[in-house]
C-alpha cells in the first residue's frame, strides 16, 4: 500500500509545476519547526500586503495552470480506477468460495477424529487468501484517496486564486496548509495506534493458538468421555430390554385381571339397568296418577278463580261508588274550607287595621304628653328668667346704698361661683 501511494504521489508531482508541489509524507513536525511555522504565519500578512500586481498575475497564472492539469488528471484516472475495480470484483468472486471452505474442512476432520492440519499450513493459507482480498481493497482505497486529494487540492488552489485576484492575499491557502498539518499529525497518531493494535493482535493470535491447543485437548477428552458413555449406553440398553420384558409380562397379567374385573362390572351394570327399568316403569305409573290428580285440582282452581273474579268485579264496583262519594264529599269540604279561609283572611285584615289604628292613637298620646311636658318646662324656665332678671312686675324694692353694694357683691360672688 505504501509503495502504491508513493507511485501515485510521484505521478502527481510530475504533472504539477515544481514551484507549487508539496509533500504530505514524513515525520511529524518538531516543536522548533512548529515555532518557525507559527512565526511564518504571523509574518505572512506583511508579505501578502507587499505583493505587487505583477506577482499576483504570475501566481494566478501558475494556479490556473495547476487547476487545468488537475482537471486533466481527473479525466485520466477514472479509466484505471474502473479497470482495477473490475479486477478486484473478479478476484473477490474467485476467492469467495475458497475462504469459507476451511472451517467446513476443519469441522469434518474433527467429526471423523482424523489428524488435523498443522498450524503453519493453516496460517499460510489464511495469509494467502487475506493478502489477495487486502490488495484489491487497498487499491480501491488508494484510488479513492487520490481522487479525493486531487479534488481537494483543486478546490484549495481555486479558492486561493480567487482570493489572490480579489484582495492580493492567499490566507485561505495558509489555512488549508494548517488543516493538512493537523491532519498529518492525526495520521501519525493513527499509525502509532495501529502499531499498538498490531502488537495486540499478535498477542491475541498467540493466545488463540493456546486456546486451539486447549480445545484439541478438550476434544480428545470429550472423545474418551463419549466412548465411556457408549459403554454405559450398552449397559443401559441391556437393562432396558430386561425391564421391557418384565413390563410386558406384567402388563399382560394386569390386562387379564382388568378384563375379569370389567366382565364382573358389566354383569353388575346389567343388573343395575334392569332395576332402573323397573323403577322407571313404576315412576311412569305414578306420574300418570299425579297428572290426573293435578288436572282435577286445576279444574277446581279454575272454578274458584272464576268465583273470585266475579267477586272482585262486584267489590271493585262497590269501592268505586264509595270513592265517587268520597270525592264529592271532598269537593264540598274543599269549598267550605275555601269560604272559611276567605273569612279568616278578612278577619286578619280587620285585626291588622285595628292594631294600626291603636298604634297611631298611642303615638299621638305620647306626642301630646311630650309636648305638654315641654311646654311646662318652657313656662317654668321663662318664669325663672323673669324673676331673676326682674322683668315686668317682678321688680324688687330699692334699699340703701350699702345694702345695694353688699347685694351687688354677693350677686357677683354668686355669679362667679356659678361660672
Swiss-Prot record:
InterPro entries: IQ_motif_EF-hand-BS (IPR000048), IQCG (IPR042618). It holds the Pfam family IQ. GO terms for molecular function: calmodulin binding; Hsp70 protein binding. The keyword Cytoplasm applies. Signal peptide: none annotated. Keywords: Calmodulin-binding, Cell projection, Cilium, Cytoplasm, Cytoskeleton, Differentiation, Flagellum, Spermatogenesis. Residues 34-44 have a biased composition (Acidic residues). Residues 1-47, 393-419 are annotated as: Disordered. The keyword Magnesium does not apply. GO terms for biological process: cilium organization; sperm axoneme assembly; spermatid development. Its main location: cytoplasm. Residues 371-400 form the IQ domain. It is found in: Cytoplasm; Cell projection, Cilium, Flagellum; Cell projection, Cilium; Cytoplasm, Cytoskeleton. GO terms for cellular component: cytoplasm; cytosol; manchette; motile cilium; sperm flagellum. PANTHER family: DYNEIN REGULATORY COMPLEX PROTEIN 9 (PTHR14871:SF1). Component of the nexin-dynein regulatory complex (N-DRC), a key regulator of ciliary/flagellar motility which maintains the alignment and integrity of the distal axoneme and regulates microtubule sliding in motile axonemes. Binds calmodulin when cellular Ca(2+) levels are low and thereby contributes to the regulation of calcium and calmodulin-dependent protein kinase IV (CAMK4) activity; contributes to the regulation of CAMK4 signaling cascades. Required for normal axoneme assembly in sperm flagella, normal sperm tail formation and for male fertility. This is Dynein regulatory complex protein 9.
Amino acid at each position: 500500500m505504501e509503495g502504491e501511494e508513493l507511485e501515485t504521489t510521484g505521478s502527481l508531482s510530475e504533472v504539477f509545476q515544481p514551484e507549487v508541489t508539496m509533500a504530505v509524507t514524513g515525520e511529524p513536525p518538531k516543536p522548533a519547526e512548529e515555532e518557525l511555522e507559527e512565526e511564518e504565519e504571523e509574518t505572512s500578512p506583511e508579505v501578502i500586503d507587499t505583493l505587487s500586481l505583477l506577482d499576483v498575475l504570475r501566481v494566478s497564472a501558475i494556479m490556473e495552470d495547476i487547476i487545468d492539469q488537475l482537471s486533466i488528471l481527473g479525466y485520466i484516472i477514472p479509466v484505471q480506477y474502473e479497470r482495477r475495480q473490475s479486477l478486484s470484483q473478479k478476484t473477490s468472486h474467485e476467492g469467495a468460495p475458497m475462504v469459507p471452505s476451511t472451517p467446513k474442512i476443519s469441522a469434518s476432520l474433527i467429526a471423523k477424529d482424523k489428524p488435523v492440519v498443522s498450524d503453519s499450513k493453516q496460517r499460510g493459507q489464511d495469509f494467502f487468501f487475506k493478502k489477495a482480498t487486502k490488495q484489491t481493497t487497498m487499491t480501491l482505497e488508494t484510488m479513492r484517496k487520490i481522487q479525493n486529494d486531487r479534488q481537494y487540492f483543486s478546490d484549495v488552489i481555486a479558492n486561493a486564486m480567487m482570493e489572490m485576484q480579489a484582495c492580493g492575499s492567499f490566507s485561505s491557502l495558509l489555512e488549508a496548509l494548517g488543516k493538512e498539518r493537523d491532519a498529518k499529525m492525526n495520521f501519525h497518531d493513527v499509525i502509532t495506534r495501529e502499531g499498538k493494535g498490531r502488537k495486540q493482535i499478535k498477542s491475541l493470535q498467540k493466545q488463540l493458538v493456546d486456546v486451539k491447543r486447549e480445545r484439541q485437548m478438550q476434544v480428545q477428552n470429550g472423545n474418551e468421555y463419549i466412548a465411556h458413555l457408549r459403554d454405559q449406553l450398552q449397559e443401559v440398553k441391556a437393562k432396558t430390554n430386561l425391564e421391557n420384558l418384565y413390563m410386558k409380562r406384567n402388563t399382560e397379567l394386569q390386562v387379564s385381571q382388568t378384563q375379569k374385573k370389567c366382565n364382573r362390572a358389566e354383569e353388575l351394570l346389567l343388573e343395575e339397568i334392569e332395576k332402573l327399568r323397573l323403577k322407571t316403569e313404576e315412576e311412569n305409573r305414578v306420574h300418570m296418577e299425579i297428572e290426573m290428580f293435578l288436572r282435577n285440582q286445576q279444574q277446581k282452581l279454575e272454578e274458584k278463580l272464576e268465583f273470585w273474579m266475579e267477586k272482585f268485579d262486584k267489590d271493585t264496583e262497590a269501592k268505586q261508588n264509595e270513592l265517587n262519594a268520597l270525592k264529592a264529599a271532598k269537593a264540598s269540604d274543599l269549598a267550605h274550607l275555601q269560604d272559611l279561609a276567605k273569612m279568616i283572611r278578612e278577619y286578619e285584615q280587620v285585626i291588622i287595621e285595628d292594631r294600626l289604628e291603636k298604634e297611631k292613637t298611642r303615638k299621638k298620646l305620647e306626642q301630646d304628653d311630650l309636648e305638654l311636658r315641654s311646654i311646662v318646662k318652657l313656662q317654668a324656665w321663662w318664669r325663672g328668667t323673669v324673676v331673676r332678671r326682674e322683668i315686668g312686675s317682678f321688680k324688687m324694692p330699692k334699699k340703701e346704698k350699702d345694702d345695694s353694694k353688699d347685694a351687688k357683691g354677693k350677686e357677683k360672688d354668686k355669679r362667679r361661683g356659678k361660672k
